[in-house]
Amino acid sequence: MGWCLLMMSNEDSILIFEYFTASGEKDKCIISEAEALIFNLLDDLKDYNLTLVIDKSYEDLIGEYENVNPILIEENLIDWLENNATKYKKAIFIAAENDNNLYNISKILEDNNVETYNSSAEACSISSNKFKTYESLFNIVPQPRSFKIKIDPKGYWKRAIDNLYKKWKSEDPLSSFKIILKPLNGVDCEDIVILEDIDDLSYDLEKIFPPGSRILVQDYIEGIDVSVSLLCDGRNAIPICLNEQFVELKNDRGTYLGGRSPFTSKHKDEAFQTH
């Protein structure tokens, strides 16, 4: 069996990988979900010839898949892709948006004429940047008011946020009001700050958002945190399931704790509406 797999043509095989399991990540908070994703993908594609890029530590776990030709690596995944992507015609991969991994991997594959069953590099660039996403959906779907601000070295950003907060609050002075500050790029509630009182704003914010970085300032919307999983060909979107996300807000900071899927809600049909 092993020799047949090794003789498999790259043109007949789909290159697949998951970023963390291919990178040798050992953080249990990350790797348990990553392992579930890649092994579920292998199960879903059991009728196809696959080339799996995975860290060498998983060598004993992939022998049961007769349709899989494993490539066990110990080097950096991005380096491996830059040197080997040109050998393949098709690819499916799983990666988070951290550090622009999703965009960088998509761009490498596209530049090497690999057909991917993922979003395009351009789409990844937009969706990984919160303000680009806001601009692309402007006047298409309801969104909280949003403003992009640069954390400049002279501290003018503090005055800008202060003025923005007071302007928005003056429009509805009797309601409770909060704003949320987010990095332009980031996932899983990474480095978010919630301000209920503008007097809580201080230059300590530069410990979270260093000078030179850009942030998104938005209305904070109370409610249940959800997401929708969907399939899209660039024109048509097919919703698959509604997911609940568990976010802990403590000391005006947010921490992503995980999620539940599927999530049942009376608002499901509304969430599934496409434009």
Predicted regions and their residues:
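Short, Lys/Arg-enriched N-terminal segments with co-localized hydrophobic residues
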Residues: M1-L6
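Short glycine-rich anion-binding loops that position phosphate/pyrophosphate groups of nucleotides
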Residues: F20-A22, A96-D99, L184-G186
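ATP-grasp fold ATP-binding core
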Residues: L137, W168-I194, S213-G223, V228, ...
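Short beta-strand-to-turn element immediately C-terminal to the catalytic PLP-Schiff-base lysine
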Residues: I149, I192-D197, L231-D233
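ATP-dependent carboxylate/phosphate-activation module, predominantly the ATP-grasp catalytic core
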Residues: D219-D225, S229-H275
